[in-house]
Amino acid sequence: MPLVKKAKEMGLEVHCFAWEEGAVCKDIVNYFYPISIVEKEEILKICQEVDIDGICTIASDVAAPTVAYVANKMNLVGNNYEAAVRANNKYQMREAFVKVGVPCPKYMMVTPETLRSPEVIDALREFQYPMITKPSDRSGSLGVTKIVMPSQFYPAVEFAMEKSFKHQAMIEEFVEGREISVEFISYNGVHYPLQITDKITTEAPHFVELEHHQPSTLSDEMFTTIYDITKNALNALGLTNGASHAEYKITKDGRIAIMEIGGRMGGDFIGSALVRLSTGYDFVKGVIDVALGVFVVPVKTLNMCAGVYFLCKETEHLKSIVESWSDNPAFVEGEITDTELREVTCSADRSGYVIYQGKTKLKV
């Protein structure tokens, strides 16, 4: 919705492709097509008939390859299709990082056919518990599990493969440390850093995100280091245009490990709201400008704090705060999205949120 609303605000004719069920943009776009976002040939045909001027997505990993494919075929501004596919596969991503020395956790990929093979069993000797398993091609904490003992290994990996589109699971070294994410916007291979976010998650086994706060409390020196690593990671993947969102762990002894990077802005309101609230830069408009080939170098006009708290069973003390968010001038938006509060295993299990902006971090 933020992308569609911004495009309409800019006076653009908006064509949207999505599954019809739950398509919240259906009634406000100029043209809606009930087509799966992975149907790249069908989408390309329509885009060619319309003769579009640009194509983009802001928070969908699944849509990113289709966006790149259409842009490439129509000579529009976008990422290379192969790069977009690479950024959508955690194994290919890690392989690209290792080739150029981008620091990341130890990893391997398994499939149902290889999981119990002698080669995989032998390779696992290089890992120690705890470890992490996750689908190779999903986001939003879906299918992510921390494995702390051998008896959990096969059920957790099989769970990750079930959640994967391609039935592939990553097995990773578990890195203990603080979590951050990084927002960039790129145009023609030049990468512009926008913000770093501190992240708070649930404990093991699923690590679902509960809070995001900008800017991070990292030192200026660490900001520079993280930005430099992210630029190298973007170059390694071949991502040259549009938004990107990188996730990191930083250990107590200062080790930095990039977990993954996506060719889209951060979800959970990070890209669509928090960057603008903390820096003054309209990230969503920037993504549209890139797609149209009219990009302007970002200018930060604010130096504020902004953040979001999510409501779920683990944070049920927030319920009254979210319900009455408009009574507090520090809050800019809030909503109860589900009256049932569930213990979360993925981001979709959360039941509401509240967003703040202020001169300092707001603790609730």
Name each model-derived stretch.
Residues 99, 121, 286-364:
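Peripheral (often C-terminal) accessory segments that flank ATP-dependent C-N-forming ligase machineries
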